[in-house]
A protein has these predicted regions:
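Helix-loop-helix hairpin linking two adjacent transmembrane segments in secondary transporters
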Residues: 143-196
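Extracellular/periplasmic helix-loop-helix junction of adjacent transmembrane segments
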Residues: 33-65
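Conserved MFS/SLC helix-loop-helix module at the cytosolic interface between two early adjacent transmembrane helices
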Residues: 64-103
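Helix-breaking motifs and short loop linkers at transmembrane-helix boundaries and internal kinks
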Residues: 45, 77, 98-104, 115, ...
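Cytosolic juxtamembrane N-terminal segment immediately preceding the first transmembrane helix
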Residues: 1-32, 42
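Residue-level signature of mid-helix packing/kink "hotspots" within the transmembrane helices
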Residues: 30, 59-67, 117, 151-152
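Cytoplasmic helix-loop-helix junction between adjacent transmembrane helices
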Residues: 108-146
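Short hydrophobic/alpha-helical segments at membrane-entry points of transmembrane helices
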Residues: 101-109, 235-236
Length: 241
């Protein structure tokens, strides 16, 4: 197997998919700030206190469901999890455009936090299934770049939609791409290298062998107590740089 060719195939096939998926998640998470400037607070009677509550509800869902999402992605399927999340967060984003009261908006923001909580850990697990230890730093960097790049084009698109139509239409329109992309994701993505047809059998075997070799000697962490007693975790927490 030519490892360089193998890495190139994986890089050009997988990373654009990862980048687009994470960008869409950030889009549906961050466009509320544009709506706030465009009049959603006045239209729905959102006070400063309610605005703080809405933000807290989003991150409450995000906080409590990130670990369960990561566990499902690791033990079951990143492909299935992200497919469901894409449909739900796109639907929640579009539903935000038709709400007329604060309780409905609060429920949507909480659900949006829940379904988006799994995105980052699931993407990291997906990358670890496809890239070796020496390749993951670059792959993870490309994933994180989805945030600032999305801000650049989202500012232009959201500003145009608000100017041309209004904040309601902005939410409805910007939620649609996530739903459409869910079906693209389902067709394009497989959880493991062994499941794809665009790698040769020898390439799959060599990649899986290297990934398995890297996992040897790594002790599984079964609970939070073990995690906090880990030497690496203690050193990380003690690092004040």
């Amino acid at each position: 197997m030519n490892s360089s060719t193998n890495a190139t195939k994986r890089w050009w096939y997988i990373m654009p998919i990862v980048f687009i998926t994470y960008s869409l998640a950030y889009l549906d998470r961050a466009n509320f700030s544009f709506a706030s400037a465009a009049g959603i607070t006045e239209d729905l009677g959102i006070t400063k206190g309610i605005s703080s509550l809405l933000g807290a509800l989003f991150f409450l869902g995000y906080f409590f469901f990130q670990i369960p999402g990561a566990i499902y992605a690791e033990r079951r399927s990143v492909r299935k999890l992200i497919f469901i999340c894409l449909i739900l967060w796109g639907g929640c984003a579009s539903l935000t455009g038709i709400v007329h009261n604060i309780p409905a908006l609060a429920a949507i923001r909480f659900i949006l936090g829940v379904v988006e909580a799994a995105v980052m850990p699931a993407m990291l697990i997906y990358i670890s299934n496809w890239f070796t230890k020496s390749e993951r730093s670059r792959a993870n960097t490309f994933l994180i770049l989805g945030n600032p790049v999305t801000v650049l084009w989202m500012s232009v698109v959201s500003g145009y939609l608000i100017q041309a139509f209004g904040w309601r239409e902005m939410f409805i329109i910007e939620g649609v791409p996530a739903v459409i992309w869910a079906f693209c994701w389902w067709v394009l993505v497989k959880d493991k290298p062994s499941q794809v047809s665009w790698l040769a059998e020898s390439e799959k075997a060599a990649l899986q062998e290297q990934l398995d070799r890297e996992q040897q000697g790594i002790k599984a962490v079964r609970n939070y107590g073990e995690a906090f007693r880990s030497r690496n975790v203690i050193l990380l927490c003690a690092d004040r740089k």
